[in-house]
Amino acid sequence: MKILLVSDIFYPHMGGVSEHIFHLWENLRGLGHDAKILAPSFGRNQPFVNENIIRLGRAVKFPKNRSLSAITFGFTLPWSIQKLLRREQFDIVHIQGELGQTLAYFAIKYSTARNFITFHSCHEGSLGYTLAEPLMEQYFRKIDGLIAVSTVARDSASQHFPGTYRIIPNGVDIREFDGNVKPLASLAKYDPKILFVGRFEPRKGLKYLLQALPRIISVFPDAILVVVGAGIMERYYRRFIEEHVKEHVIFAVNPPRADIPHYYASCDVFCSPAIGAESFGIILLEAMAAGKPIVASDIPGYRTILVDGKEGVFCRPCDPDDLADKVIALLRDRDLREQMGRAGRAKARLHDWPIITRQILDFYTEVLNHNQ
């Protein structure tokens, strides 16, 4: 099949949607399908330059849903997208994210293929969607298949776009994170090690992990927090660290993507203190694939993937003391950490990308056959 994956969010913008698109594209092509990605340019430094990754327009980031999103601008976008679709004659156009994105909007408007959309977001309500509903309704009717990565994402999307959704979760490439990945030699001298991976923005909750660190250090004086990511809050976090826990935090800002599994392999406990607006939690899957126990906020999106007491433990959102206590409890119990790591690896195998890709392909085929 000829398949076009469309999103205003893609590398170098880091996050779950970018990961999802890349791995789905990679696996579709691995199975012999002619899959391409349509995404905007984010500037001069574009990772994953490939003839099958088509960059149209320029992305501009803006705050949304306690995070950063992007919208694409370009005077010739409508004509360029129409020309692309006419030339390629795709069988499937698959929107990743939101119908209100610029590329998604024009791709659906001009598409003559079977159209799918995967909703990744979680929000209590969207003023933008409410205002744009009358405009988008005519194009939403062109969607042949609705996918959500979780029941949380489905419930969020169906507030504005009711319909029958297929739940197909996010995936993880277990080969990237398996037990053969070596820990980083530069971190070997630190013990114990706590890991945070994510964008430096309010909803990821790094602030609460930094506030929890003094309590953890009081029990484990040599504890180190390794912070992997990038974002708008970096300067704020660095100031906090300088004043409170300078010797106990190591920043790895925007490391090469290939290094991320090595950070997971190096840690004793993985921590994700997000405060909400998460529909799934790909980083939890990555930690599970790496065999690491997890301390995560007890929020709806994380409950879709993590079982409290099995692959990790929940802590109360926005509560540094409870977060610290849960981390301390795991650091004290090596056997429990190893048990949770094994359970996590078992769950991650169920979300391996070849399995998830097959579920998506089966849904494509089901819809194509139904509409013949």
Regions found by a protein language model. Name each.
Residues 41, 152, 171:
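Carbohydrate-associated surface elements
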